[in-house]
Regions:
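Class II aminoacyl-tRNA synthetase catalytic cores and aaRS-like
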Residues: 1-582
Length: 582
């Protein structure tokens, strides 16, 4: 596995019974020290595994403590039957040594036990990341990350994509999240920006005649952290294809994601083709554009049934229902907990009915139902005896989201989600535009550079809020892995789209001059997407927080506690970039 040198001839993870009797030298960290009646046992750890070492002369251990680094030589010996450890690969052998040398001393008091570092306060972990990364579980996540990225890179090469690096020093974009800005020393008052994504560069590559581009792209966004979003930077498998349709992109994404998830997980994975779910359908049936399809519960539109109701909470509201199979037997406490959850997310209450054996209803909403409503509800929801029907009513904007949260919470509380599989889908047919609630102006919903469905004709003749775009997301188990689009490569369509969103042609020239100019010199139709590498690894390692799959993550407040970033700089450094702090 390694080339022999003065520190080691083998690694701690490779010795087996066939090595018994051999003289070896190993090096690593002292994971544990145990005294068994004058015979000392050490567990020595390196990246490749753990090896038990036996020391009969305790004088050899006078300078040795946990987590110091050592090199030692000795003889490989078969373990006694009662000491065999089948939990580790080297568990049938041990090394007996009379020669140990300390290579790197370690303080006697550790800030936390390496083996249990994941249970330690986050701030302490991030200050001593080099210790946390020794934890085998954490260490393994980073090794898996390396393997996954290597696999992705090889797969893209195999599929004919060319890896091209795009600039890290770029210009600020008027769209998207906040930029990280870098002041220029040579150009007073001007700033570079770290790219939020290689969006414009990869489109320019298509105009430049490159047919299939990809890179494992670093992206930088000044946005708040979440469990599935690292503050500061993240990585994408960014790819773009010339002369390509939406289905061409889907075919590439399906092959890459299916093979990656099959290789690095034992779970069942959706087989291509993945489900295509229109955005409007997803918002109706699942209450989100990031549906977890492992959850069997479905939301149903029932607003029309309550248009003339006397029940004030439903009057002139968007009303949705969720049928929960076999839930009628749940305790009063269970229903109370669900109501408390509903209140915690901003609902004024959570109405429901239980379906009796004779298909009549029992519950607080029943008395507000008209003749025929019960049969209609049972029909629309597919309800059976013993089921529960929940009701969610609110504004047209809020009701879908609230229903989606109730759907998810009920499934979690009843353990309805099948955790043994990865369920992937594409969300398609996103609206191109939406109306800003504060200004009432038409704005882009997502990517302003996507192609509207129907082209220029739809922009000229449709209500902007009815125009759909060739935009799409990939979702896996309720986590958005990627967004993408067929790009708008036609300058006339682009001008009209931006005009509808309140941009003049001069604005377009000023803010997006590179694309505006390039698209006047023969731009090909092109499309692409960018699956999030960190999120993929998070799912494959079954970690709940993205920090656990990043070697040097920031804390939730966007601070690097190990290096002290962001940090102060000198007055001289500020003068060089023409900045004065106030």
């Amino acid at each position: 596995m390694i080339k022999a040198n003065e520190y080691r001839t083998v690694t701690c993870g490779e010795l087996r019974e066939e090595n018994i009797g051999q003289q070896v030298r190993v090096a690593g960290w002292v994971e544990n020290i145990r005294d068994h009646g004058g015979v000392m046992f050490l567990d020595i750890r390196d990246q490749y595994g753990v090896l038990q070492v036996v020391v009969h002369n305790d004088e050899l251990l006078k300078d040795i403590n946990k987590e110091c680094t050592v090199t030692l030589s000795g003889t490989v010996v078969k373990r006694d039957e009662e000491t065999i450890n089948k939990k580790i690969a080297t568990g049938f052998v041990e090394v007996h040594t009379e020669d140990i040398k300390v290579l790197g001393k370690c303080k006697n008091v550790l800030p936390f036990e390496v083996a249990t570092s994941t249970n330690t306060n986050e701030e302490v972990i991030l200050k001593y990341l080099f210790l946390d990364l020794r934890n085998p579980k954490v260490h393994n996540n980073i090794m898996i990350r390396s393997q996954i990225i290597t696999f992705l890179r090889n797969k893209m090469n195999e599929m004919g994509f060319m890896e091209i690096q795009t600039p890290i020093l770029s210009t600020s974009s008027p769209e998207g999240a906040r930029d990280y800005l870098i002041p220029s020393r040579k150009h007073k008052g001007r700033f570079y920006a770290l790219p939020q994504a290689p969006q414009i560069f990869k489109q320019l590559l298509m105009v430049s005649g490159f047919d299939r581009y990809f890179q494992i792209a670093p992206c930088f966004r000044d946005e708040d952290a979440r469990a599935d979003r690292s503050p500061g930077e993240f990585y994408q498998l960014d790819f773009e294809m010339a002369f390509a349709t939406q289905e061409d992109v889907f075919a590439v994404a399906e092959e890459v994601l299916y093979e990656t998830f099959k290789k690095f997980s034992n779970k069942e994975v959706s087989k291509p083709p993945f489900a295509r779910i229109p955005y409007a359908e997803s918002m109706l049936k699942y209450g989100t554009d990031k549906p977890d399809l492992r959850n069997p519960l479905v939301i149903v539109e029932i607003s029309d049934m309550f248009e003339e109701t006397d029940f004030a909470p439903f009057r002139k509201k968007t009303v949705r229902s969720i049928n929960v199979p076999n839930a009628a037997g749940q305790s009063k406490k269970w229903f109370k907990k669900m109501e408390e959850f509903a209140l915690s997310i901003g609902m004024k209450g959570l109405g429901y009915v239980k379906v009796r054996d004779d298909l009549t209803f029992d519950g607080p909403i029943d008395k507000f139902l008209k003749e025929g409503d019960r049969e209609e509800l049972i029909s629309r929801n597919g309800s059976k005896a013993g089921d529960v029907i929940y009701f969610i009513a609110d504004t047209a904007q809020e009701a879908p989201k609230l229903a989606g949260q109730i759907r998810t919470e009920v499934a979690k509380r009843l353990d309805l989600i099948d955790t043994s599989r990865f369920e992937m889908c594409f969300i398609v047919d996103f609206p191109m535009f939406e109306r800003d609630e504060e200004t009432n102006q038409i704005i882009f919903t997502h990517n302003p550079f996507s192609m509207p469905q129907g082209g220029l004709d739809s922009l000229l003749n449709k209500d902007p809020e009815e125009v759909l775009a060739y935009q799409y997301d990939i979702v896996c188990n309720g986590v958005e892995l990627s967004s993408g689009a067929v790009r708008n490569h036609d300058i006339e369509i682009m001008k009209k789209a931006f005009e509808l969103a309140g941009y003049s042609e001069d604005d377009l020239k000023a803010k997006f001059s590179a694309l505006y100019n390039a698209f006047q010199y023969g731009a090909p139709p092109h499309a692409g997407m960018a699956p999030g590498v960190d999120r993929m690894i998070m799912l494959l390692t079954e970690e709940e927080n993205i920090r656990e799959v990043i070697a040097f993550p920031m804390n939730s407040n966007a601070q690097d506690l190990l290096l002290g970033s962001p940090g102060e700089v000198t007055e001289q450094q500020l003068r060089e970039v023409h900045i004065k702090l106030r």
